Amino acid sequence: MPLHIHFVGIKGTGMSALAQVTAHIEGAHITGSDVPERFFTDAVLERAHIPVLNFSAANVEKADIVVASAAYGENHEEIARARELNIPVYSYPQFLGRLMSKKRGIAVAGTHGKTTTTAMIGLALLQSGIDPTIVVGSDVPSIGGNAYSGQGDFFLAESCEYRRHFLNYSPEYLIITNIEFDHPDYFKDLDDVVCAFSEIAQKIPPHGRIFIWHEDPQRKAIQAQSPIITFGLNEEADVYATNIQFHDEGSTMTIVAHGTVLGEFHLHVSGKHNILNALASIALCLEIGVPTEKVLESLSHFNGTKRRFEHIGQNAGALIVDDYAHHPTEIRSTLEGARLSFPDRRIRAVFQPHTFSRTEKLLQEFSQSFQAADEVVIAEIFASARETNLNTISASSLADLISQQGVNARYIHSLEEIQTYLAQTLSPGDLVLTLGAGDIYKVGQSLVC
C-alpha cells in the first residue's frame, strides 16, 4: 500500500508544489485540505488529480504523514487530531528537506531573486534534457506551473531564510543571490541574517559548490568548506556580463565565464537585478555540465514568472504591470528596471506595504526607494496573519516621507479608491506598476477588465 500523505493548507504556492512532487518521489497517495476560496493553485492541483477537501479533523485519520502549512498552528483541528493519533507531522521545510535528500539538491537562497533564479535554472535544465524535479514559489509558464517532477538526479528548490527554514535542506549546490536585512519579526539585525546564510553555506559538502553575488557587501563573511564561485557585473567575478544594453524588450550583453567569452546573450526580462539572476543561473548550469549554447539559448527564451514584472494588459494606451516586490531593494530595482526599459513612459507606482514589522523597521529605506517613479500611491499596510501589534506605523506616514524625498506621493486607503483614482487619471503612455506581496495585484486586474 502506498503512503497516504495529507497536506494541511495545500493551496499555498509552496505547499501545492510540494504536494505535486511528493506524489512522484514518494509514490504516495496525496490528499489536501484548505479554505473554499479559489486560488490559481486550484487549477494546478486539479491537473495533478489531487483532491482538495474542506478542513475537518476526519481528513487526517487515515493518513500516514501530515504536512502542515506555516499558516496553521498546533491548534488547527487537523493538526491537533494528527497529534492525538501520533501521526508524524512535518512542516513545509522539514518535508521539503526529506524529499531533497533523495536526490542531488540545488538550493536557491537569497533575500531577493530566489523565485526568478529558480525558474531560470529550471527552464535551462529542462531544455538541456537533465529533467530535474523543481519546486518554485510562483507560477512559471515555461515549466508548466509551480512544480515539475522529473526523472533526473537533481532536485531544484527555492529556499527561504525565514526562521532559518533552509537549514532543513542538505543541498549539494547553493546559490546566494544576495544578503540583506529582512523579516524583522524573526531576525535581530543584518548580522543575524548573515549568520543564517553562513550556516547553510557550511552545510555544502566539499565536492559541492556555492555561487554568490560578487558585489554583495556580505560576501566575504560567508565561510564554507566547498569552493565559492562568484557572479556579477564586475570583471573580477568568475562569471560576469559586459557590454550591457537595455531596451524595451529586456537587455543584451556579452557573457564571460572563468576568463572565456561565451558570446552575446539576450534577456527578455528587464532590470539589472534580472541580469544578476541570469548570471547566477548560468554559473550554476555551467558547473553541473550544461553546454554553454544550451544555457544561453534556453535563458534567452525566459519570459518571467507570475507576479514578477508581469504584464497584465493595457487600458487606454497605459501599460499595466504587476510585481511582487515588497522590500526596499526590490522596489528600487524593479522601478529602475522599468525606467531603463520604458524611458518615455510616466511610471506610476502603486505600493502596498507588507507587514507592519517590515514597514516599521525599514521605513527610511522604503522612503528612498521610489526615486525612479513619477508618481507613487501608497495603499494601506497588508498585515501578516502572524502579526499581533498592528499599530506601530501608518501607511500615510510612509507616503509623507516619500514626498519629502521630492517624489509625488499620496496615501489612498482602500484598493477600491485606488482603482477609481487610477481609472480616472490614466493617460496614454502611462506605466502603472503595482508592487507588493499582498493583494495589490487586484488593482491592476481591475484596470484591464
Curated annotation (Swiss-Prot):
Enzyme class, top EC level, equals ligase
Gene Ontology cellular-component terms for this entry are: cytoplasm
Q: Which GO terms describe its biological process?
A: cell division; cell wall organization; peptidoglycan biosynthetic process; regulation of cell shape
Q: Name one GO molecular function term.
A: ATP binding
Q: Does the keyword Cell division apply?
A: yes
InterPro entries given for it? Answer: Mur-like_cat_sf, Mur_ligase_C, Mur_ligase_C_dom_sf, Mur_ligase_cen, Mur_ligase_N, MurCDEF_pg_biosynth, UDP-N-AcMur_Ala_ligase_MurC
UniProtKB keywords: ATP-binding, Cell cycle, Cell division, Cell shape, Cell wall biogenesis/degradation, Cytoplasm, Ligase, Nucleotide-binding, Peptidoglycan synthesis
Gene3D superfamilies from the UniProt entry: Mur ligase, C-terminal domain, Mur-like, catalytic domain, NAD(P)-binding Rossmann-like Domain
- Keyword Acyltransferase listed? The answer is no
Q: Name one Pfam family in it.
A: Mur_ligase
Enumerate the subcellular locations listed in this protein's record, separating them with semicolons.
Answer: Cytoplasm
Q: Which reaction does it catalyse?
A: UDP-N-acetyl-alpha-D-muramate + L-alanine + ATP = UDP-N-acetyl-alpha-D-muramoyl-L-alanine + ADP + phosphate + H(+)
The EC number(s) given in the record are 6.3.2.8
Q: Where does ATP bind?
A: G110, T111, H112, G113, K114, T115, T116
UniProt pathway: Cell wall biogenesis; peptidoglycan biosynthesis
According to its UniProt entry, the function of this protein is described as: Cell wall formation.
Question: Of which family is this protein a member?
Answer: Belongs to the MurCDEF family.
Q: Which HAMAP family match?
A: MurC (MF_00046)
Which protein are we looking at? Answer: UDP-N-acetylmuramate--L-alanine ligase
Which species expresses this protein natively? Desulfitobacterium hafniense (strain Y51)
Question: Gene name?
Answer: murC
